[in-house]
Amino acid sequence: NRHLAEAISIDLEEAFVDYNDVMSRIEEIIKVSINAVNDYIKNNPDSEFTPTPVPESIPRYTYDDLVDRMQKAGAKTEWGDDLYPSNLKKIGLDGFYFITDWPLGPKPFYVKDSKSNPKISESFDLMFGDLELSSGSTRIEKRDELAQRMSNKGMKTDSFEYHLNAFDYGVPPHAGCGIGLERLIMALTGTENIRDTTFYPRDVDRLTP
Protein backbone atom coordinates (compact mmCIF):
# COMPACT_ATOMS: atom_id res chain seq x y z
CA ASN A 1 0.00 0.00 0.00
CA ARG A 2 3.05 2.30 -0.13
CA HIS A 3 4.80 1.43 -3.42
CA LEU A 4 4.23 2.49 -7.02
CA ALA A 5 6.08 1.50 -10.18
CA GLU A 6 5.92 5.12 -11.33
CA ALA A 7 6.06 7.98 -8.83
CA ILE A 8 6.72 11.72 -8.70
CA SER A 9 9.78 13.00 -6.84
CA ILE A 10 10.18 16.60 -5.69
CA ASP A 11 13.94 17.19 -5.88
CA LEU A 12 15.67 19.98 -3.97
CA GLU A 13 19.33 20.98 -4.36
CA GLU A 14 20.92 24.05 -2.79
CA ALA A 15 24.46 25.46 -2.79
CA PHE A 16 26.46 26.47 0.29
CA VAL A 17 24.28 24.48 2.71
CA ASP A 18 24.49 21.10 4.43
CA TYR A 19 21.96 18.44 5.35
CA ASN A 20 20.81 20.34 8.43
CA ASP A 21 19.78 23.26 6.24
CA VAL A 22 17.87 20.96 3.89
CA MET A 23 15.96 19.48 6.83
CA SER A 24 14.98 23.02 7.82
CA ARG A 25 13.74 23.65 4.27
CA ILE A 26 11.66 20.47 4.39
CA GLU A 27 10.23 21.51 7.74
CA GLU A 28 9.01 24.74 6.14
CA ILE A 29 7.48 22.79 3.24
CA ILE A 30 5.65 20.45 5.62
CA LYS A 31 4.19 23.31 7.66
CA VAL A 32 2.99 25.18 4.56
CA SER A 33 1.53 21.97 3.14
CA ILE A 34 -0.33 21.12 6.35
CA ASN A 35 -1.79 24.63 6.49
CA ALA A 36 -2.93 24.35 2.85
CA VAL A 37 -4.68 21.03 3.49
CA ASN A 38 -6.25 22.33 6.71
CA ASP A 39 -7.57 25.39 4.85
CA TYR A 40 -9.11 23.09 2.25
CA ILE A 41 -10.79 21.02 4.96
CA LYS A 42 -12.09 24.18 6.64
CA ASN A 43 -13.57 25.45 3.38
CA ASN A 44 -14.97 22.04 2.44
CA PRO A 45 -16.75 20.73 5.54
CA ASP A 46 -17.96 17.64 3.67
CA SER A 47 -14.37 16.56 3.05
CA GLU A 48 -13.42 13.15 4.42
CA PHE A 49 -10.03 14.44 5.56
CA THR A 50 -9.15 15.26 9.18
CA PRO A 51 -7.18 18.43 10.03
CA THR A 52 -3.56 17.83 11.06
CA PRO A 53 -1.92 19.87 13.84
CA VAL A 54 1.00 21.98 12.60
CA PRO A 55 4.15 20.97 14.52
CA GLU A 56 6.29 23.69 16.06
CA SER A 57 9.29 21.71 14.85
CA ILE A 58 9.94 18.27 13.43
CA PRO A 59 11.94 16.04 15.83
CA ARG A 60 15.34 14.77 14.72
CA TYR A 61 16.58 11.39 15.97
CA THR A 62 19.95 9.91 15.13
CA TYR A 63 20.18 6.46 13.56
CA ASP A 64 22.23 5.28 16.57
CA ASP A 65 19.53 6.44 18.99
CA LEU A 66 16.78 4.55 17.18
CA VAL A 67 18.84 1.35 16.86
CA ASP A 68 19.39 1.50 20.63
CA ARG A 69 15.66 2.00 21.24
CA MET A 70 14.78 -0.89 18.94
CA GLN A 71 17.18 -3.26 20.64
CA LYS A 72 15.75 -2.31 24.05
CA ALA A 73 12.26 -2.97 22.64
CA GLY A 74 13.33 -6.48 21.64
CA ALA A 75 13.78 -5.91 17.91
CA LYS A 76 16.39 -8.01 16.12
CA THR A 77 18.52 -5.30 14.55
CA GLU A 78 22.20 -4.42 14.48
CA TRP A 79 24.15 -1.29 13.65
CA GLY A 80 24.31 -1.01 9.88
CA ASP A 81 20.90 -2.60 9.26
CA ASP A 82 18.11 -0.71 7.59
CA LEU A 83 15.39 0.50 9.98
CA TYR A 84 12.47 -1.61 8.84
CA PRO A 85 8.85 -0.44 9.32
CA SER A 86 8.12 -3.41 11.59
CA ASN A 87 10.91 -2.33 13.95
CA LEU A 88 9.94 1.35 13.81
CA LYS A 89 6.44 0.35 14.94
CA LYS A 90 7.93 -1.32 18.02
CA ILE A 91 9.28 1.99 19.34
CA GLY A 92 6.03 3.85 18.73
CA LEU A 93 7.17 6.88 16.76
CA ASP A 94 4.38 8.69 14.96
CA GLY A 95 3.83 11.90 13.02
CA PHE A 96 6.65 13.61 11.15
CA TYR A 97 10.26 13.10 12.26
CA PHE A 98 13.77 12.88 10.82
CA ILE A 99 16.27 10.02 11.16
CA THR A 100 19.76 11.48 10.80
CA ASP A 101 23.39 10.38 10.55
CA TRP A 102 22.94 7.02 8.86
CA PRO A 103 25.84 4.59 8.31
CA LEU A 104 27.77 5.57 5.18
CA GLY A 105 28.07 2.05 3.75
CA PRO A 106 24.68 1.60 2.05
CA LYS A 107 24.30 5.24 1.03
CA PRO A 108 24.72 6.39 -2.62
CA PHE A 109 28.20 7.30 -3.86
CA TYR A 110 27.56 11.07 -3.77
CA VAL A 111 26.68 11.25 -0.05
CA LYS A 112 29.26 13.00 2.11
CA ASP A 113 30.71 11.38 5.20
CA SER A 114 30.77 13.02 8.62
CA LYS A 115 33.82 15.08 9.54
CA SER A 116 33.86 13.49 12.99
CA ASN A 117 33.32 9.86 11.92
CA PRO A 118 34.00 8.53 8.39
CA LYS A 119 31.64 5.59 9.00
CA ILE A 120 28.70 7.98 9.38
CA SER A 121 27.05 9.97 6.58
CA GLU A 122 25.65 13.49 6.64
CA SER A 123 22.25 12.18 5.64
CA PHE A 124 18.64 11.94 6.76
CA ASP A 125 15.28 10.36 6.07
CA LEU A 126 12.01 12.19 6.67
CA MET A 127 9.45 9.82 8.14
CA PHE A 128 5.75 9.85 8.93
CA GLY A 129 5.23 7.03 11.40
CA ASP A 130 6.86 4.06 9.67
CA LEU A 131 6.48 5.60 6.18
CA GLU A 132 9.58 7.08 4.50
CA LEU A 133 8.76 10.34 2.71
CA SER A 134 12.18 11.72 1.79
CA SER A 135 15.90 11.02 1.77
CA GLY A 136 18.59 13.67 1.60
CA SER A 137 22.19 14.45 2.37
CA THR A 138 25.15 16.73 2.07
CA ARG A 139 26.72 15.96 -1.30
CA ILE A 140 30.38 15.42 -2.19
CA GLU A 141 31.69 18.44 -4.11
CA LYS A 142 35.26 17.33 -4.90
CA ARG A 143 35.94 15.30 -8.06
CA ASP A 144 38.72 13.13 -6.60
CA GLU A 145 36.65 12.23 -3.57
CA LEU A 146 33.64 11.44 -5.73
CA ALA A 147 35.67 9.25 -8.10
CA GLN A 148 37.20 7.38 -5.16
CA ARG A 149 33.77 6.73 -3.67
CA MET A 150 32.58 5.37 -7.02
CA SER A 151 35.56 3.03 -7.17
CA ASN A 152 34.96 1.89 -3.60
CA LYS A 153 31.44 0.89 -4.59
CA GLY A 154 32.64 -1.06 -7.62
CA MET A 155 31.44 1.49 -10.14
CA LYS A 156 33.34 2.12 -13.38
CA THR A 157 34.34 5.77 -13.30
CA ASP A 158 34.82 5.76 -17.09
CA SER A 159 31.07 5.34 -17.45
CA PHE A 160 30.50 8.49 -15.41
CA GLU A 161 33.18 10.70 -16.95
CA TYR A 162 30.53 13.12 -18.24
CA HIS A 163 29.39 13.63 -14.64
CA LEU A 164 32.87 13.88 -13.16
CA ASN A 165 33.94 16.40 -15.81
CA ALA A 166 31.48 18.93 -14.41
CA PHE A 167 33.41 18.90 -11.15
CA ASP A 168 36.58 20.04 -12.94
CA TYR A 169 35.06 23.51 -13.23
CA GLY A 170 34.37 23.82 -9.52
CA VAL A 171 31.26 22.73 -7.65
CA PRO A 172 30.24 24.55 -4.45
CA PRO A 173 29.40 22.72 -1.24
CA HIS A 174 25.80 21.64 -1.62
CA ALA A 175 23.06 19.42 -0.26
CA GLY A 176 19.71 18.14 -1.41
CA CYS A 177 16.91 15.64 -1.15
CA GLY A 178 14.04 13.97 -2.95
CA ILE A 179 10.48 13.96 -1.57
CA GLY A 180 7.96 11.38 -2.73
CA LEU A 181 4.88 13.41 -3.67
CA GLU A 182 2.37 10.58 -3.41
CA ARG A 183 3.68 9.51 0.00
CA LEU A 184 3.61 13.12 1.19
CA ILE A 185 -0.05 13.30 0.15
CA MET A 186 -0.69 10.11 2.13
CA ALA A 187 0.76 11.74 5.24
CA LEU A 188 -1.07 15.04 4.78
CA THR A 189 -4.48 13.50 4.12
CA GLY A 190 -4.42 10.30 6.16
CA THR A 191 -4.77 8.20 3.01
CA GLU A 192 -3.88 4.56 3.72
CA ASN A 193 -3.21 3.32 0.18
CA ILE A 194 -0.81 5.15 -2.12
CA ARG A 195 -2.92 4.14 -5.13
CA ASP A 196 -5.53 6.64 -3.93
CA THR A 197 -3.11 9.58 -4.17
CA THR A 198 -2.54 9.57 -7.93
CA PHE A 199 -4.90 9.71 -10.92
CA TYR A 200 -3.51 6.71 -12.82
CA PRO A 201 -1.62 4.50 -10.35
CA ARG A 202 0.93 2.18 -11.92
CA ASP A 203 2.22 -0.81 -9.98
CA VAL A 204 3.02 -4.49 -10.56
CA ASP A 205 -0.63 -5.20 -11.40
CA ARG A 206 -1.43 -2.18 -13.58
CA LEU A 207 0.41 -0.29 -16.31
CA THR A 208 -2.46 1.27 -18.26
CA PRO A 209 -4.21 3.60 -18.30
Where do the language-model regions lie?
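Active-site pocket scaffolds in enzymes
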Residues: 137-138, 143-209
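A generic structural motif
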Residues: 11-22, 130-132
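Short loop/turn segments at secondary-structure transitions that flank enzyme active sites
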Residues: 18, 67, 105, 132, ...
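Metal-assisted phosphate- and nucleotidyl-transfer catalytic regions
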Residues: 26-129, 152-170
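Residues in well-ordered beta-strands of folded domains
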Residues: 13, 99-100, 127, 134, ...
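Residues forming anionic-ligand binding surfaces in small-molecule and nucleic-acid pockets
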Residues: 1-16, 123-125
